[in-house]
Design a protein with these regions (language model features):
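Alpha-helical transmembrane segments of multi-pass membrane transport proteins
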Residues: 1-429
Length: 429
């Protein structure tokens, strides 16, 4: 019956059925064939959603939508440009810096690409950067969204396996910063080599002060999330609700751009995004129940450990496997299906679960800007095509140097656990 489970799942995916419903169809087919009472389906479906931690997903999503409704994208980019726009490749740095700050609000990569890309790409093109490079840095920097907390993929990984969401958030900060600095260094080298323009006038303190005042409300929200969780003052779910109240206050009373129409749009986008994730979680929990019942995770773990028990080789094999998976499968779906199984392998060779969670999230998130199914790359390319010639192949070529650096950071994080759990333990104990 295991064969039926995987055949139905793969066939459903092949004909275009969404991943969540493919998991559900495969689970139903297995249960009917194995004569398992369907009450088990309902029980495990509900059990997958019965989590206080999962409440922070609609919370962070709604808070990000509220802030974005107030035009936070423009304000963040102006703030970043005021700080670094006067140096060589300054707008590229500003692109990365804005993504790093926006990551602390949204928690997803695609929202970063769409919200910031519509502002960043035309601004870069107008100042003399070529379109493919503008698209590439926008797509690559958007991957910081799910790595710098709050992070929806990290919430999924922690919830599925009983790990601490707060600790995983803290463990993602340094890898996110390393990715950002690595991309900035790459931008500098490429900007010097290609003679990209820079702003001739140094920044004026009045300009920096004005840009900071405009962006300060977004920066405060990032502080609420990071320091509230890091200090043990609030849980991630409580932080998300505080951010919703804060975002509502800022949008209505500070930015004054929140009317009934805008509120409806924010609620609609939030419900659409959060419900898709919740459905995926529920169906994946039923699928995971079946895999556990058939001892699939332990069989895979035993098979890998028969190949080698060397921790470093195991991590290398898992990295290569996840890089491949990330090129074809949506991040959250891959985490829900694969993470519990691979975690059993990693812990068997002595890898810290939090450290391994960051490795898995980084691998799969980087797949968001790699073909053939890189949704962030496609979204950024579509935006760039409005402002000049830019095909998908042009974007991929421009993306290669950034991907090399990003994967280099991935392997550094993989083999230096202090960058993740070491920092998290120092901060949270």
């Amino acid at each position: 019956m295991v064969a039926v489970l995987f055949i139905v799942f793969l066939v459903a995916l092949a004909i275009g059925v969404p991943v969540a419903f493919s998991l559900g169809l495969a689970s139903v087919a297995y249960m009917l064939g194995a004569h398992i009472q369907m009450i088990n389906f309902a029980q495990y479906f509900f059990k997958g959603l019965d989590s206080f931690t999962l409440l922070c997903i609609p919370g962070f999503t709604f808070a990000g939508n509220l802030m974005n409704q107030g035009g936070i994208s423009d304000k963040l980019l102006d703030f970043a440009d005021a700080l670094v726009g006067h140096v060589t490749g300054g707008l590229a740095y500003a692109n990365v810096l804005a993504s790093m700050v926006f990551a602390g609000i949204s928690g997803t990569a695609l929202s970063d690409t769409v919200a910031l890309g519509g502002v960043e790409i035309p601004m870069m093109v107008n100042q003399g950067y070529d379109v493919p490079f503008s698209v590439a840095i926008t797509a690559a920097s958007s991957c910081l969204g799910p790595i710098i907390p709050p992070s929806v993929p990290m919430i999924m990984a922690a919830t599925m396996t009983g790990l601490s969401v707060s600790k995983m958030f803290m463990a993602g900060i340094v890898p996110g910063l390393l990715l950002g600095f690595g991309m900035c260094a790459t931008c500098y080298i490429l900007s010097v080599k290609r003679h990209y323009p820079k702003r001739n006038t140094p920044p004026k303190w009045s300009h920096i002060w004005h840009a900071t005042k405009e962006a300060i409300w977004a920066l405060i929200m990032v502080g609420i999330i990071l320091f509230g969780i890091m200090g043990g003052i609030v849980t991630p779910t409580e932080a998300s609700i505080i951010c919703v109240v804060y975002g509502l206050f800022v949008s209505v009373f500070i930015y004054r751009k929140m009317g009934p129409k805008e509120m409806y749009s924010c609620l609609k986008d939030t419900v659409s995004s959060a419900s898709a994730i919740m459905a995926l979680v529920a169906f994946a929990n039923v699928f995971a129940f079946i895999l556990t019942k058939e001892h699939i995770p332990s069989m895979i773990a035993d098979a890998m450990l028969h190949l080698t028990t060397n921790k470093y080789l195991i991590l290398l094999l898992i990295n290569l496997f996840l890089i491949f998976v990330g090129m074809f499968m949506e991040t959250i779906a891959a985490i829900l299906i694969l993470f519990p199984t691979l975690l059993a392998v990693a812990t068997a060779v002595g890898v810290d679960p939090i450290h391994f969670g960051i490795i898995v999230v980084m691998n799969l998130v980087l797949g968001l800007c790699t073909p053939p199914v890189g949704v962030c790359l496609f979204a950024a390319t579509n935006i760039g095509a409005r402002y000049g010639k830019c095909t998908l192949s042009d974007s991929v070529k421009a993306l290669v140097p950034l991907l090399i650096v990003n994967f280099g950071v991935l392997f550094l994080v993989t083999y230096v656990p202090f960058l993740t759990v070491g920092v998290a333990n120092l901060v949270m104990g």
